[in-house]
């Protein structure tokens, strides 16, 4: 991850020859506004380091502009209709929590259905929404906090020096030692 005054840039290795990159762009931009040359120029600029590392250009195989949005449906059930995964909640990709939440929903719903149909006990099934919403809101809070940390912007989408310093102080706390770092690690991995 690179926090830069021109916006966030991310470099995620997928293999020894393939990487996924992320660039923060102004709201309202379209894919057409980002030709390959502009993408590589901004990546080189935002990911620049003080050592001998350099970005290796290659073909851009896919381009998308992602609208960062989040929502939660409460409750996650209506009568006998139970919602799980993206049908119940959408998160920003920050922190990569969507699939974990969907699997947690599916597991809890499956356990509730098994108890309902095999043991004639509907307690867990009736508690499904309340049980899962606690985890959903924890993940939403983490995802949105991480999004703000990585993409925090000020007036007209440009980082404000004060906000930038606050973000950098927060990063120092979560990458160091102590309770905030442990809490962040638990939330990021868990």
Residue ranges and their predicted role:
Residues 1-64, 73:
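Conserved FAD-binding catalytic core of PHBH/FMO-like flavoproteins
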Residues 19, 106-110:
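Structural motif of enzymes handling amino- and sulfur-group chemistry
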Residues 26, 49-56, 96, 111-190:
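C-terminal helical "tail/cap" subdomain of flavin- and related membrane-associated enzymes
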Residues 66-89:
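FAD-binding beta-loop-beta segment adjacent to the flavin cofactor pocket
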Residues 89-90, 135:
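Active-site micro-motifs of SAM-dependent methyltransferase domains
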Residues 93-103:
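A conserved FAD-binding loop/helix module that cradles the flavin
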């Amino acid at each position: 991850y690179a926090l830069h005054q021109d916006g966030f840039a991310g470099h995620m290795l997928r293999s020894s020859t393939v990487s996924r990159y992320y660039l923060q762009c102004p709201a309202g931009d379209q894919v057409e506004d980002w030709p390959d040359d502009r993408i590589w120029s901004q990546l080189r600029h935002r990911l620049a380091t003080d050592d001998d590392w350099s970005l290796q250009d290659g073909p851009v195989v896919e381009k998308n502009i992602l609208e960062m949005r989040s929502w939660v449906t409460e409750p996650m059930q209506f009568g006998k209709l139970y919602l799980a995964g993206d049908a119940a909640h959408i998160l920003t990709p920050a922190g990569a929590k969507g699939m974990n939440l969907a699997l947690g929903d599916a597991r809890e719903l499956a356990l509730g259905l098994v108890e309902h149909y095999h043991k004639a006990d509907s307690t867990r099934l009736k508690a499904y929404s309340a049980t899962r919403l606690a985890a959903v809101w924890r993940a939403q809070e983490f995802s949105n906090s991480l999004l703000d940390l990585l993409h925090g912007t000020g007036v007209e989408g440009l980082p404000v020096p004060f906000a930038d310093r606050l973000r950098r102080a927060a990063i120092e706390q979560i990458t160091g030692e102590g309770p905030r770092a442990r809490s962040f690690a638990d939330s990021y991995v868990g």
